[in-house]
Structure formats: structure tokens, C-alpha cells
């Protein structure tokens, strides 16, 4: 054990000291890739061959991970410097894993990093997918993912009926123009009941006399998981929407991480109006 720890300490000290390694260039086609969080896991699992994945995050196979089935059987690693560096990856992929300074640290330690980032709208989701695919050396796979996404969007545009939808969370929060959720509602051929921009409390007064055709419920498997007794979702007017309107339950794996898999949520909302 001592023989293992000593060189690791030396490696970490060299990465943090005066003799920092020069920032490594990203390989054209990385073959020893480590993913530090479950958002990064999705892209690594979708775009890379399994033999090129050195390790995934501990959450890769959890229920809220969209690519959880593909993660089965692959090694995982904690997003700590010592655990990652000892694997000697040729590329690290991350969104938030390892903390805010992780990207700078790994680059200075000589390990190139792909930062997944966040996307505010559907076009940027596709642009981000292609950028990540390019950086992973899998441009064609990224283009294929985007082509499929574009086809699914085109199919939905033919089903537009203008019914009204309201996005609801256990905390009683909804969202309007300017959010990715709003774009998803519109992509499903629906009209968002929330017309004010940004994230806001559900419009209880309006719901007292007007109901949506569809509720997009982001309760992730539970309609009773309220954060506290003061949540607007405790109000009878809000609860009524779950029985008087068509309800589509959105899986957390569909809407988290702002990836191509949000199309599952979009299609579920579109199909909800046809029941």
C-alpha cells in the first residue's frame, strides 16, 4: 500500500506545485475516457465504444440516468483527483463532477477535459451534442444523434393542435418563455399556460377558473413528495389539476442534463393530448 500511495502523492504534488505539467492536447480519438458525473455519463455512453470508457460516475446506472442500461458492467470512479489520476485517463468529461475547479486542475495535471456545459434551448442542445462528439473524436455519431432528433421534431410539427399545457413540480413551480421546458412544450405542439418568462409559482388564481388541457408533472415518480407544507402544490386548486386535466408524468432522466433525450419528454407530452 505504501508503494502505491507514495507515487500518487508525488503526482498530486507535481500537479499543484510550481512544476505544473503543460496543458495536454486533446487526443484526436481518446481511448481512456473518464466521466465525472451522470450528465457527462450520458454523452460518453452514447458516443463512445465501451472499450474506450475507462470509468463512469457512481450515478451512471441510477434510475435518473437516461443511459443507465448501457452503464451496466462498466467501472465507476469517485470524482476526486487522486481516484481519477491514478487511472491515467487520456480525457476527462465533466459537467459539475469534481467541483468548480476540477477542469483547471486536470488540465494543469496534463489531462485534457471536455466540459459538457448547459444549454438554454433546443438548437443549442444539438449544437452541444455535436461539439462534444467532435471533441470525443466521434463526429459522425454526433451528427446521427442530431439527425434523429431533427426527424422526431419534424414529425411532431405535423401534430400541432394548440392545446394548453402547464408544467408543475412538487414545489409548486412552473416556467414560461425563456426556459428549455417552455421550448419543449412548444415543440410538442402545445401552448404553455405560463406566459410570463422565467421560473415562477404556479398561477393559482388563474387555475381557479381556467384549467390546462394537459399537466406536465415533473414529480419524478411521486405526486406526494412536497418539500414543505407551504408548497403551492398543497393548495386544493393545484391538486385538482392532477385529476381534472390529462397528466403526463415526466421522468427525471428525460429532462435532466439538457440532452437529446429530452425528446422522450416532448413526445410524451404530444401523445398525452391524444388520449
Annotated model-derived regions:
Residues 13-15:
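C-terminal motif of bacterial Sec signal peptides marking the signal peptidase cleavage site
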Residues 76, 80-94, 201-220:
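Proline-aspartate-enriched helix->loop->beta-strand connector
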Residues 32-97, 101-102:
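A short, structured surface patch at a secondary-structure boundary
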Residues 58-64, 70-73, 174-203:
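Alpha-helical, coiled-coil/dimerization segments enriched in small aliphatic residues
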Residues 31-44, 140-189:
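Basic- and aromatic-lined ligand-binding clefts that recognize polyanionic substrates
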Residues 17-20:
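Bacterial signal peptide processing site
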